């Protein structure tokens, strides 16, 4: 047992599907304390975060759309450990959210995807100057990390690979951050994939997907009924090797989210990817 005060946690995007899962997970963790729930949807303003997340009892934490005052409130509490904000919002707002949090000394744990490489580098520089930890994690599933590690191992033996990512039809960005990260991990191996065998012609633009790092193509599917799924398909003469990860419940991300909340306090810079803290 420890007498250390629990870590103050703000959830941004609290009314979303991932936000509600994070609220439940944080509320059930004895070393964490939900102190704020932010959401810009007017429909949910002033509702209790616990009730909105489906908990049996209210948490007495109202939903608010005021991010800056909440950051200031948590930053000013000198009796508690440094605060953490978990961000599952939107690609259009996440960059500003992260900069604001770092400016207040609040450690961001970011699951929102859609940041450009230039934005990530700028945030990394900002976090370095502030000596403040920040985690940007495209996918919090430990199973997805294992898939990516298996893909790295397989890439030593296959020259041809493509990625298919499938998500629910309310996902705003494509390709997914996880698919881009998977391609980046393979691209960092210093190997060029998919050597051209014929001159291809796309009868419809984009029919062959987008080209990511080192010639790896990514294909995106958006349909109702899906949550989050990814295939990495390797091909060679006479064989196909397929790696696939399926998410059937968003609860699968919560062990990774809780791990990130606890780990980010010890960081002094921006770290990208769950695999870096496992």
From Swiss-Prot:
Record carries keyword Repeat: no
Subcellular location: Cytoplasm
Keywords from the named record: Amino-acid biosynthesis, Cytoplasm, Diaminopimelate biosynthesis, Lysine biosynthesis, NAD, NADP, Oxidoreductase
The protein's annotated pathway: Amino-acid biosynthesis; L-lysine biosynthesis via DAP pathway; (S)-tetrahydrodipicolinate from L-aspartate: step 4/4
Protein name: 4-hydroxy-tetrahydrodipicolinate reductase
Keyword Oxidoreductase attributed: yes
Cross-referenced CDD domains: DHDPR_N
Function: Catalyzes the conversion of 4-hydroxy-tetrahydrodipicolinate (HTPA) to tetrahydrodipicolinate.
Protein's organism: Nostoc punctiforme (strain ATCC 29133 / PCC 73102)
Active site residues according to the UniProt entry: 167 (proton donor/acceptor), 171 (proton donor)
Gene: dapB
Family annotation (SUPFAM superfamilies): Glyceraldehyde-3-phosphate dehydrogenase-like, C-terminal domain, NAD(P)-binding Rossmann-fold domains
GO molecular function, one term: NAD binding
Family affiliation: Belongs to the DapB family.
